UniProtKB/Swiss-Prot annotation:
InterPro entries: Bifunctional_GlmU (IPR005882), GlmU-like (IPR050065), GlmU_C_LbH (IPR038009), Hexapep (IPR001451), Hexapep_transf_CS (IPR018357), MobA-like_NTP_Trfase (IPR025877), Nucleotide-diphossugar_trans (IPR029044), Trimer_LpxA-like_sf (IPR011004)
Region (Linker): 227-247
Keyword NAD: no
Assembly and binders: Homotrimer.
Known EC number: 2.7.7.23, 2.3.1.157
GO BP annotations, alphabetical order: cell morphogenesis; cell wall organization; lipid A biosynthetic process; peptidoglycan biosynthetic process; regulation of cell shape; UDP-N-acetylglucosamine biosynthetic process
Keyword Nucleus: no
Chain residues that bind Mg(2+): D102, N224
Protein name: Bifunctional protein GlmU
Span list, region Pyrophosphorylase: 1-226
Keywords: Acyltransferase, Cell shape, Cell wall biogenesis/degradation, Cytoplasm, Magnesium, Metal-binding, Multifunctional enzyme, Nucleotidyltransferase, Peptidoglycan synthesis, Repeat, Transferase
Length: 454
């Protein structure tokens, strides 16, 4: 049976006190709505219909690359009204999963269970047992079957003792949605159309309402303010760290780790405190990441050790390499095996060969460096002429003396040596020594200036 995912994302989010629409607030490096869309795609839904309202243009622009049908809810007249807006584009057959743009972490496996259960009955929902159900709609059952959802303010004292609550996540046959949604009424204290009313309609039609429980409570938690957003962030990060530890990662402190994307890990990876991983990363066997490092869209091969406060973005690092502390690898940095990149070294759009080293205070941009070369402290590849970038090529077994400036485009041949303090503007031949500096002048018995007496 074909599946449609309907996402309600029209809310204003007043309590966020933000100019950014609520569903665009970030959680683990991705907008709230982005999490929901990602899950919908994992479910292989044939259609994703997103209902937008406040900040609609901004929301649509953010997800312009996604294959989504957008439906506007110009007036926010309740959850039932929001789903009513989809009827003109909602298929007549199949089943629809109803999700929320501010409930970002419902997992694929949980939703697949709901879809499977709902396919058998025509309607299903996710419920949750909680210790304190105050404020939530209660699930009223008879002989184990769902009979009604009673809002807290309308519940009897006996019903208020019920600890099973409505999460608002439903899966309903499209045929029934086309039948029930036009019948919704706004004759209530709020003057709104409630989606929960379809439960009573299902019972009246003699349908059994399937229900499942999520494995993790935070899967169905919504976000209304920044306190809830922060709390959900920490719950999610805790769960991600747990899953990585189950894969063999050792954390110095799992509570001080943030994953804002995906990471594939090998065996015996060690991660120190306050590490942030963003985008899509991969860490090989026995990789060690020091405290305070940031990794984004980076691959690090087996045995490499990264010391504290190093930053990676779009880098590829070979095996048994030593990096940091305070190193920066920018997009296009490609390091072979057994490379050393030391403190305050920046590498951008540069390939570095086997065993080469740049241990201190160096900028390597738009360069190609061969194997077993040594780049002295303070070396700079001068790659930018004010208008265009140019390439520096350094061969194998090259020695670059400290405080050298290599003005691109320039090539340093295999086995060449560049003397310290040189400004190299011409190609250097293989196995040669090149240096360029002013002649040293020494003045004997030099007297330093004295301070004037006031």
């Amino acid at each position: 049976m074909s599946t449609t995912v309907i996402i309600l994302a029209a809310g204003k989010g007043t309590r966020m006190r933000s100019q950014l629409p609520k569903v665009l607030q970030p959680l683990a490096g991705r907008p709230l709505l982005g999490h929901v869309i990602k899950t919908a795609k994992q479910l292989l839904a044939e259609n994703i219909i997103t209902i937008y309202g406040h900040g609609g243009d901004h929301v649509k622009k953010t997800f312009a690359q996604e294959n989504i049908q957008w439906v506007e809810q110009a007036e926010q007249l309740g959850t039932g009204h929001a789903v009513q807006m989809t009827l003109p584009v909602l298929p007549k057959d199949g089943i629809s999963l109803i999700l929320y743009g501010d409930v970002p972490l419902a997992r694929q496996t949980t939703l697949e269970q709901l879809i499977e259960a709902s396919n058998k009955t025509g309607i299903g929902m996710i419920t949750l047992h909680v210790d304190n159900p105050t404020g939530y709609g209660r699930i009223v059952r008879q002989d184990g079957k769902i009979q009604a959802i009673v809002e807290h303010k309308d519940a009897t004292e006996a019903q208020r003792q019920i600890q099973e609550i409505n999460t608002g996540i439903y899966c309903v046959s499209n045929a029934k949605l086309h039948e029930w949604l036009p019948k919704l009424s706004n004759e209530n204290a709020q003057g709104e159309y409630y989606l929960t009313d379809i439960v009573a309609m299902a019972v009246a039609d003699g349908l059994e309402i399937a229900s499942i429980q999520p494995e993790l409570a935070f899967e169905v938690e919504g976000v209304n303010d920044r306190l809830q957003l922060a709390a959900l962030e920490r719950e999610f990060q805790k769960q991600q760290a747990k899953e990585l530890m189950q894969q063999g990662v050792t954390f110095a402190d799992p509570a001080r780790f943030d994953l804002r994307g995906t990471v594939k890990v090998g065996h015996d990876v060690r991660i120190d405190v306050n590490v942030i991983i963003e985008g899509d990363c991969e860490l090989g066997d026995f990789v060690e990441i020091g405290a305070g490092c940031i990794l984004k869209n980076t691959t690090i091969a087996a045995g490499t050790k990264v010391q504290a406060y190093s930053v990676f973005d779009g880098a590829v690092v070979g095996e048994n390499t030593q990096i940091g502390p305070f190193a920066r690898l920018r997009p296009g940095a490609k390091l072979a095996n057994e490379v050393h990149i030391g403190n305050f070294v920046e590498v951008k759009n540069t390939t570095i060969g086997l065993g080469s080293k740049a241990n201190h205070f160096t900028y390597l941009g738009d360069a190609e460096i061969g194997a077993e070369s040594n780049i002295g402290a303070g070396t700079i590849t001068c790659n930018y002429d004010g208008a265009n970038k140019h390439k520096t090529t350094i061969g194998d077994a090259v020695f670059i003396g400290s405080n050298s400036s290599l003005v691109a485009p320039v090539t340093i041949g295999n086995g060449a040596t560049v003397g310290a303090g040189s400004v190299i503007t011409k190609d250097v031949a293989e196995q040669s020594l090149s240096f360029e500096r002013a002649q040293q002048i020494s003045k004997a018995n030099y007297q330093r200036p004295q301070k004037l007496k006031k």
